[in-house]
Amino acid sequence: MGRDILIGFVGKPSSGKSTMLNALTDATAKTGNFPFTTIEPNRAIGYAQIECACSRFGLQDKCKPIYGGCKNGVRSIPIQLLDVAGLIPGAHAGKGLGNKFLDDLRHADALVHVVDVSGTTDAEGKVCRGYDPSVDIAWLYKEITAWIGNNLREKWPNIVRRHIATKANPVNTLQSQFSGYGSTPAVTAKVLDSLHLDTPLEKWDDDTIEKVVNRFVDIKFPTVIALNKIDHPDADANISKIARKEDPNRLVLASAISEVFLRRLAKQGFVKYEEGSEFVDTLDDFPDSGLKPLSENLKTRIADLQDMVLFRHGSTGVCNVLAKAMELLNLIPVFPVKNVHNFANSPNEGVFRDCILVKQGTTAGQVSQMVLGGEAMSIVGVNGNVGESDVIVPGKTDILHFRLRKAEA
Protein backbone atom coordinates (compact mmCIF):
# COMPACT_ATOMS: atom_id res chain seq x y z
CA MET A 1 0.00 0.00 0.00
CA GLY A 2 3.04 2.21 0.24
CA ARG A 3 2.00 4.36 3.18
CA ASP A 4 -0.11 4.41 6.30
CA ILE A 5 -3.88 4.51 5.94
CA LEU A 6 -5.46 7.90 6.74
CA ILE A 7 -9.16 8.27 7.57
CA GLY A 8 -10.57 11.80 7.26
CA PHE A 9 -13.39 12.90 9.57
CA VAL A 10 -15.77 15.54 8.26
CA GLY A 11 -18.87 17.07 9.75
CA LYS A 12 -20.58 20.41 10.16
CA PRO A 13 -20.17 22.30 13.46
CA SER A 14 -22.10 20.67 16.33
CA SER A 15 -22.46 17.36 14.48
CA GLY A 16 -20.49 15.61 17.23
CA LYS A 17 -17.38 15.12 15.12
CA SER A 18 -15.03 16.23 17.90
CA THR A 19 -16.78 13.95 20.39
CA MET A 20 -16.51 11.07 17.92
CA LEU A 21 -12.79 11.70 17.48
CA ASN A 22 -12.32 11.91 21.25
CA ALA A 23 -14.08 8.57 21.67
CA LEU A 24 -11.99 6.89 18.97
CA THR A 25 -8.66 8.26 20.19
CA ASP A 26 -9.27 7.57 23.88
CA ALA A 27 -9.33 3.79 23.60
CA THR A 28 -8.08 1.91 26.65
CA ALA A 29 -5.82 -0.09 24.33
CA LYS A 30 -3.71 2.99 23.68
CA THR A 31 -0.14 2.41 24.85
CA GLY A 32 1.55 5.58 23.68
CA ASN A 33 3.36 3.66 20.95
CA PHE A 34 2.35 3.85 17.31
CA PRO A 35 4.16 3.11 14.05
CA PHE A 36 4.03 6.67 12.72
CA THR A 37 7.02 8.99 12.70
CA THR A 38 5.20 12.30 13.20
CA ILE A 39 1.66 13.31 14.02
CA GLU A 40 0.52 16.67 12.64
CA PRO A 41 -1.68 18.98 14.75
CA ASN A 42 -4.92 18.04 12.97
CA ARG A 43 -4.14 14.32 13.08
CA ALA A 44 -4.65 11.76 15.82
CA ILE A 45 -4.38 8.03 16.41
CA GLY A 46 -7.53 5.94 16.55
CA TYR A 47 -7.88 2.22 17.12
CA ALA A 48 -9.74 -0.14 14.81
CA GLN A 49 -10.87 -3.42 16.35
CA ILE A 50 -10.38 -6.73 14.54
CA GLU A 51 -10.44 -10.39 15.49
CA CYS A 52 -6.84 -11.26 16.33
CA ALA A 53 -5.16 -14.43 15.08
CA CYS A 54 -4.40 -15.35 18.71
CA SER A 55 -8.05 -16.33 19.24
CA ARG A 56 -7.74 -19.14 16.65
CA PHE A 57 -5.11 -20.88 18.76
CA GLY A 58 -6.33 -20.10 22.29
CA LEU A 59 -3.37 -17.78 22.88
CA GLN A 60 -5.27 -14.67 23.96
CA ASP A 61 -3.41 -14.47 27.27
CA LYS A 62 -0.03 -14.52 25.49
CA CYS A 63 -0.79 -11.96 22.77
CA LYS A 64 1.34 -8.83 23.19
CA PRO A 65 1.15 -6.46 20.20
CA ILE A 66 3.97 -3.97 19.75
CA TYR A 67 1.39 -1.36 18.74
CA GLY A 68 -2.16 -1.00 20.02
CA GLY A 69 -3.36 -3.86 22.20
CA CYS A 70 -5.29 -7.11 22.34
CA LYS A 71 -7.92 -8.09 24.88
CA ASN A 72 -9.73 -11.42 24.82
CA GLY A 73 -8.81 -11.91 21.17
CA VAL A 74 -10.01 -8.48 20.03
CA ARG A 75 -7.05 -6.56 18.68
CA SER A 76 -6.89 -2.76 18.51
CA ILE A 77 -4.86 -1.57 15.54
CA PRO A 78 -3.65 2.04 15.43
CA ILE A 79 -4.86 4.04 12.43
CA GLN A 80 -4.19 7.68 11.62
CA LEU A 81 -7.24 9.95 11.75
CA LEU A 82 -7.51 13.37 10.12
CA ASP A 83 -9.75 16.11 11.51
CA VAL A 84 -10.96 17.90 8.38
CA ALA A 85 -12.16 21.35 9.44
CA GLY A 86 -14.25 23.95 7.62
CA LEU A 87 -17.24 21.98 6.37
CA ILE A 88 -20.06 24.40 5.51
CA PRO A 89 -22.15 24.87 2.35
CA GLY A 90 -20.08 26.76 -0.22
CA ALA A 91 -16.74 25.31 0.90
CA HIS A 92 -15.81 24.61 -2.74
CA ALA A 93 -16.12 28.35 -3.41
CA GLY A 94 -13.86 29.21 -0.47
CA LYS A 95 -16.55 29.99 2.11
CA GLY A 96 -15.50 29.50 5.73
CA LEU A 97 -12.36 27.39 5.83
CA GLY A 98 -13.32 25.88 2.48
CA ASN A 99 -9.88 25.96 0.89
CA LYS A 100 -8.26 24.27 3.89
CA PHE A 101 -11.13 21.78 4.12
CA LEU A 102 -10.64 20.63 0.55
CA ASP A 103 -6.85 20.66 0.74
CA ASP A 104 -6.94 18.44 3.84
CA LEU A 105 -9.51 16.18 2.23
CA ARG A 106 -7.28 15.08 -0.64
CA HIS A 107 -4.86 13.29 1.70
CA ALA A 108 -7.53 10.90 3.03
CA ASP A 109 -7.98 7.30 1.85
CA ALA A 110 -11.55 7.22 3.14
CA LEU A 111 -13.92 9.63 4.84
CA VAL A 112 -16.20 9.41 7.83
CA HIS A 113 -19.04 11.92 7.55
CA VAL A 114 -20.38 12.54 11.05
CA VAL A 115 -24.04 13.51 10.66
CA ASP A 116 -26.24 14.94 13.42
CA VAL A 117 -29.16 12.58 12.93
CA SER A 118 -31.20 14.24 15.70
CA GLY A 119 -32.16 17.06 13.32
CA THR A 120 -31.53 19.69 16.00
CA THR A 121 -28.83 21.65 14.13
CA ASP A 122 -29.11 23.31 10.72
CA ALA A 123 -26.61 23.23 7.83
CA GLU A 124 -24.26 25.61 9.65
CA GLY A 125 -24.55 23.88 13.01
CA LYS A 126 -26.97 26.35 14.59
CA VAL A 127 -29.58 25.02 17.02
CA CYS A 128 -32.99 24.36 15.48
CA ARG A 129 -35.75 21.72 15.42
CA GLY A 130 -36.96 19.52 12.60
CA TYR A 131 -33.94 19.87 10.30
CA ASP A 132 -33.55 17.14 7.67
CA PRO A 133 -30.05 15.64 8.14
CA SER A 134 -30.21 13.83 4.79
CA VAL A 135 -29.56 17.26 3.27
CA ASP A 136 -26.12 17.31 4.92
CA ILE A 137 -25.16 14.03 3.25
CA ALA A 138 -26.18 15.36 -0.16
CA TRP A 139 -24.35 18.66 0.05
CA LEU A 140 -21.08 17.17 1.27
CA TYR A 141 -21.01 15.06 -1.88
CA LYS A 142 -21.90 18.10 -3.99
CA GLU A 143 -19.14 20.17 -2.37
CA ILE A 144 -16.48 17.60 -3.24
CA THR A 145 -17.71 16.97 -6.78
CA ALA A 146 -18.12 20.71 -7.43
CA TRP A 147 -14.57 21.38 -6.23
CA ILE A 148 -13.02 18.76 -8.51
CA GLY A 149 -15.46 19.32 -11.39
CA ASN A 150 -14.99 23.09 -11.49
CA ASN A 151 -11.20 22.70 -11.46
CA LEU A 152 -11.39 20.19 -14.31
CA ARG A 153 -13.79 22.23 -16.48
CA GLU A 154 -11.69 25.36 -16.05
CA LYS A 155 -8.68 23.57 -17.56
CA TRP A 156 -10.60 21.35 -19.99
CA PRO A 157 -9.75 23.14 -23.29
CA ASN A 158 -6.03 22.97 -22.48
CA ILE A 159 -6.35 19.37 -21.29
CA VAL A 160 -7.96 18.35 -24.59
CA ARG A 161 -5.34 20.17 -26.70
CA ARG A 162 -2.50 18.47 -24.81
CA HIS A 163 -4.27 15.11 -24.99
CA ILE A 164 -4.52 15.32 -28.78
CA ALA A 165 -1.02 16.74 -29.29
CA THR A 166 0.69 14.04 -27.22
CA LYS A 167 -1.60 11.23 -28.41
CA ALA A 168 -2.02 10.25 -24.77
CA ASN A 169 -4.48 7.65 -23.53
CA PRO A 170 -7.40 8.80 -21.34
CA VAL A 171 -5.95 7.26 -18.16
CA ASN A 172 -2.70 9.21 -18.43
CA THR A 173 -4.50 12.44 -19.31
CA LEU A 174 -6.93 12.20 -16.39
CA GLN A 175 -4.29 10.96 -13.96
CA SER A 176 -2.29 14.15 -14.58
CA GLN A 177 -5.34 16.03 -13.25
CA PHE A 178 -6.51 13.63 -10.53
CA SER A 179 -3.04 13.11 -9.02
CA GLY A 180 -3.50 16.38 -7.13
CA TYR A 181 -6.37 14.75 -5.26
CA GLY A 182 -4.26 11.80 -4.17
CA SER A 183 -5.21 9.51 -7.04
CA THR A 184 -3.04 6.78 -8.52
CA PRO A 185 -3.04 5.45 -12.10
CA ALA A 186 -4.82 2.33 -10.83
CA VAL A 187 -7.63 4.42 -9.31
CA THR A 188 -8.01 6.51 -12.46
CA ALA A 189 -8.08 3.38 -14.62
CA LYS A 190 -10.75 1.87 -12.36
CA VAL A 191 -12.88 5.00 -12.76
CA LEU A 192 -12.82 4.81 -16.56
CA ASP A 193 -13.21 1.04 -16.72
CA SER A 194 -16.32 1.19 -14.54
CA LEU A 195 -18.03 3.75 -16.82
CA HIS A 196 -17.50 1.92 -20.14
CA LEU A 197 -17.30 5.19 -22.08
CA ASP A 198 -17.35 4.88 -25.88
CA THR A 199 -16.87 8.58 -26.60
CA PRO A 200 -13.25 9.76 -27.14
CA LEU A 201 -12.01 12.08 -24.38
CA GLU A 202 -11.71 15.06 -26.73
CA LYS A 203 -15.46 14.84 -27.43
CA TRP A 204 -16.67 14.61 -23.85
CA ASP A 205 -19.47 17.03 -22.98
CA ASP A 206 -20.29 18.47 -19.55
CA ASP A 207 -22.53 15.53 -18.67
CA THR A 208 -19.73 13.04 -19.37
CA ILE A 209 -17.23 15.07 -17.36
CA GLU A 210 -19.72 15.14 -14.48
CA LYS A 211 -20.13 11.36 -14.65
CA VAL A 212 -16.36 10.88 -14.56
CA VAL A 213 -15.94 13.26 -11.61
CA ASN A 214 -18.78 11.64 -9.65
CA ARG A 215 -17.37 8.17 -10.19
CA PHE A 216 -13.89 9.37 -9.24
CA VAL A 217 -15.21 10.75 -5.94
CA ASP A 218 -17.09 7.49 -5.27
CA ILE A 219 -13.94 5.42 -5.78
CA LYS A 220 -11.26 7.75 -4.39
CA PHE A 221 -13.20 8.84 -1.29
CA PRO A 222 -15.28 5.90 0.01
CA THR A 223 -17.38 7.44 2.76
CA VAL A 224 -18.81 6.05 5.97
CA ILE A 225 -21.93 7.91 7.04
CA ALA A 226 -21.84 7.94 10.83
CA LEU A 227 -25.36 8.81 11.99
CA ASN A 228 -24.52 10.34 15.34
CA LYS A 229 -26.74 11.26 18.31
CA ILE A 230 -28.96 8.18 18.03
CA ASP A 231 -29.69 8.71 21.73
CA HIS A 232 -31.93 11.67 20.80
CA PRO A 233 -35.71 11.01 20.69
CA ASP A 234 -36.04 12.55 17.20
CA ALA A 235 -33.34 10.36 15.67
CA ASP A 236 -35.45 7.34 14.67
CA ALA A 237 -37.53 9.08 12.02
CA ASN A 238 -34.45 10.63 10.44
CA ILE A 239 -32.58 7.31 10.46
CA SER A 240 -35.47 5.66 8.60
CA LYS A 241 -35.54 8.43 6.00
CA ILE A 242 -31.79 8.26 5.40
CA ALA A 243 -31.84 4.45 5.22
CA ARG A 244 -34.30 4.68 2.32
CA LYS A 245 -32.02 7.06 0.39
CA GLU A 246 -28.49 5.84 1.11
CA ASP A 247 -26.58 2.61 0.63
CA PRO A 248 -27.07 0.75 3.95
CA ASN A 249 -23.54 -0.66 3.63
CA ARG A 250 -22.20 2.85 4.28
CA LEU A 251 -24.31 3.61 7.36
CA VAL A 252 -23.24 3.30 10.99
CA LEU A 253 -25.52 4.25 13.88
CA ALA A 254 -23.63 5.83 16.77
CA SER A 255 -23.81 7.83 19.96
CA ALA A 256 -20.36 9.28 20.50
CA ILE A 257 -21.36 11.14 23.65
CA SER A 258 -22.60 7.88 25.20
CA GLU A 259 -19.27 6.19 24.45
CA VAL A 260 -17.29 9.04 25.99
CA PHE A 261 -19.58 9.04 29.05
CA LEU A 262 -19.20 5.29 29.64
CA ARG A 263 -15.43 5.33 29.19
CA ARG A 264 -15.12 8.20 31.65
CA LEU A 265 -17.16 6.32 34.26
CA ALA A 266 -15.06 3.20 33.68
CA LYS A 267 -11.80 5.13 34.14
CA GLN A 268 -13.13 6.66 37.35
CA GLY A 269 -14.03 3.21 38.71
CA PHE A 270 -17.82 3.56 38.71
CA VAL A 271 -18.59 0.93 36.07
CA LYS A 272 -17.02 -1.94 34.20
CA TYR A 273 -17.36 -1.31 30.47
CA GLU A 274 -15.53 -2.58 27.41
CA GLU A 275 -15.54 -0.62 24.16
CA GLY A 276 -18.02 -1.98 21.65
CA SER A 277 -20.00 -3.88 24.28
CA GLU A 278 -23.67 -3.58 25.20
CA PHE A 279 -22.98 -4.39 28.85
CA VAL A 280 -22.37 -1.94 31.70
CA ASP A 281 -21.66 -3.50 35.09
CA THR A 282 -22.13 -1.53 38.30
CA LEU A 283 -21.69 -2.11 42.03
CA ASP A 284 -25.37 -3.13 42.23
CA ASP A 285 -24.67 -5.92 39.72
CA PHE A 286 -21.46 -7.11 41.38
CA PRO A 287 -21.24 -6.07 45.07
CA ASP A 288 -17.74 -7.55 45.46
CA SER A 289 -16.32 -5.95 42.31
CA GLY A 290 -14.65 -3.01 44.04
CA LEU A 291 -16.57 -0.53 41.90
CA LYS A 292 -17.58 2.82 43.39
CA PRO A 293 -21.24 3.44 44.29
CA LEU A 294 -23.27 5.49 41.79
CA SER A 295 -25.42 8.49 42.63
CA GLU A 296 -29.10 8.27 41.74
CA ASN A 297 -28.50 10.77 38.94
CA LEU A 298 -25.79 8.59 37.37
CA LYS A 299 -27.95 5.49 37.75
CA THR A 300 -30.76 7.23 35.86
CA ARG A 301 -28.42 8.41 33.10
CA ILE A 302 -27.01 4.91 32.63
CA ALA A 303 -30.49 3.37 32.56
CA ASP A 304 -31.64 5.89 29.94
CA LEU A 305 -28.51 5.26 27.87
CA GLN A 306 -29.10 1.52 28.02
CA ASP A 307 -32.73 1.90 26.92
CA MET A 308 -32.06 4.38 24.09
CA VAL A 309 -28.76 3.02 22.79
CA LEU A 310 -27.23 -0.18 24.16
CA PHE A 311 -30.28 -2.45 24.35
CA ARG A 312 -31.69 -1.16 21.05
CA HIS A 313 -28.51 -1.11 18.96
CA GLY A 314 -26.14 -3.52 20.73
CA SER A 315 -23.45 -0.90 21.38
CA THR A 316 -22.79 2.83 21.11
CA GLY A 317 -21.67 2.14 17.53
CA VAL A 318 -18.43 4.10 17.85
CA CYS A 319 -16.19 1.06 17.40
CA ASN A 320 -18.12 0.19 14.24
CA VAL A 321 -17.07 3.42 12.53
CA LEU A 322 -13.46 2.46 11.83
CA ALA A 323 -14.47 -1.14 11.19
CA LYS A 324 -16.80 0.10 8.45
CA ALA A 325 -14.05 2.32 7.01
CA MET A 326 -11.75 -0.73 6.85
CA GLU A 327 -14.53 -2.65 5.12
CA LEU A 328 -15.05 0.06 2.48
CA LEU A 329 -11.29 0.14 1.87
CA ASN A 330 -11.22 -3.67 1.58
CA LEU A 331 -8.53 -3.94 4.27
CA ILE A 332 -7.57 -7.22 5.90
CA PRO A 333 -4.97 -7.93 8.61
CA VAL A 334 -1.76 -9.90 8.05
CA PHE A 335 0.37 -11.20 10.93
CA PRO A 336 4.12 -11.42 10.16
CA VAL A 337 5.85 -13.78 12.61
CA LYS A 338 9.36 -15.15 13.11
CA ASN A 339 8.06 -18.61 13.93
CA VAL A 340 4.93 -20.15 12.40
CA HIS A 341 4.83 -22.84 15.09
CA ASN A 342 4.70 -20.73 18.26
CA PHE A 343 4.05 -17.29 16.64
CA ALA A 344 6.63 -15.60 18.90
CA ASN A 345 9.74 -13.59 18.10
CA SER A 346 11.44 -14.88 21.25
CA PRO A 347 10.35 -16.98 24.25
CA ASN A 348 9.61 -13.99 26.50
CA GLU A 349 8.04 -11.52 24.07
CA GLY A 350 4.56 -12.92 23.56
CA VAL A 351 2.82 -13.95 20.34
CA PHE A 352 1.59 -12.07 17.28
CA ARG A 353 3.64 -8.98 18.01
CA ASP A 354 3.08 -7.47 14.56
CA CYS A 355 0.06 -6.83 12.39
CA ILE A 356 -0.30 -4.86 9.17
CA LEU A 357 -3.34 -3.97 7.08
CA VAL A 358 -3.36 -4.77 3.36
CA LYS A 359 -5.88 -4.50 0.55
CA GLN A 360 -7.84 -7.59 -0.41
CA GLY A 361 -6.08 -9.13 -3.40
CA THR A 362 -2.60 -8.39 -2.03
CA THR A 363 -0.12 -11.21 -2.65
CA ALA A 364 2.34 -12.74 -0.21
CA GLY A 365 5.16 -11.30 -2.32
CA GLN A 366 3.73 -7.80 -1.97
CA VAL A 367 3.50 -8.25 1.80
CA SER A 368 7.17 -9.28 1.74
CA GLN A 369 7.99 -5.98 0.03
CA MET A 370 6.06 -4.08 2.72
CA VAL A 371 7.66 -5.92 5.64
CA LEU A 372 11.22 -6.39 4.38
CA GLY A 373 11.51 -3.69 1.76
CA GLY A 374 12.48 -6.43 -0.69
CA GLU A 375 11.94 -10.03 -1.72
CA ALA A 376 12.08 -12.95 0.68
CA MET A 377 13.99 -16.13 -0.16
CA SER A 378 10.89 -18.04 0.83
CA ILE A 379 7.56 -17.43 2.54
CA VAL A 380 6.12 -19.89 5.03
CA GLY A 381 2.60 -20.03 6.43
CA VAL A 382 0.96 -22.15 9.09
CA ASN A 383 0.17 -24.83 6.51
CA GLY A 384 3.52 -24.82 4.70
CA ASN A 385 5.18 -22.83 1.94
CA VAL A 386 3.34 -19.90 0.38
CA GLY A 387 4.08 -18.69 -3.14
CA GLU A 388 4.89 -15.04 -3.85
CA SER A 389 1.88 -14.84 -6.15
CA ASP A 390 -0.50 -16.41 -3.62
CA VAL A 391 -3.23 -13.99 -2.57
CA ILE A 392 -3.65 -13.34 1.15
CA VAL A 393 -6.71 -15.21 2.44
CA PRO A 394 -7.91 -14.48 6.01
CA GLY A 395 -7.63 -17.57 8.17
CA LYS A 396 -5.45 -19.41 5.64
CA THR A 397 -2.45 -17.37 4.46
CA ASP A 398 -2.56 -14.36 6.78
CA ILE A 399 0.11 -15.64 9.22
CA LEU A 400 3.46 -15.48 7.43
CA HIS A 401 7.16 -15.95 8.11
CA PHE A 402 9.62 -14.45 5.64
CA ARG A 403 12.99 -16.13 5.20
CA LEU A 404 15.53 -13.54 4.15
CA ARG A 405 17.79 -13.87 1.16
CA LYS A 406 21.43 -14.11 2.19
CA ALA A 407 23.47 -11.05 1.36
CA GLU A 408 25.88 -11.59 -1.51
CA ALA A 409 29.57 -11.50 -0.62
From Swiss-Prot:
**Localization annotation:** Cytoplasm; Nucleus
Domain (OBG-type G): residue spans on this chain: 5-274
Q: Which SUPFAM superfamilies match?
A: P-loop containing nucleoside triphosphate hydrolases
- The protein's predominant localisation is cytoplasm
Fetch the InterPro entries from UniProt: Beta-grasp_dom_sf, G_OBG, GTP-bd, P-loop_NTPase, YGR210-like_G4
Binding annotation for GTP: 11-18, 83-87
Q: What is this protein called?
A: Uncharacterized GTP-binding protein C428.15
Organism the protein comes from: Schizosaccharomyces pombe (strain 972 / ATCC 24843)
Taxonomic lineage: Eukaryota, Fungi, Dikarya, Ascomycota, Taphrinomycotina
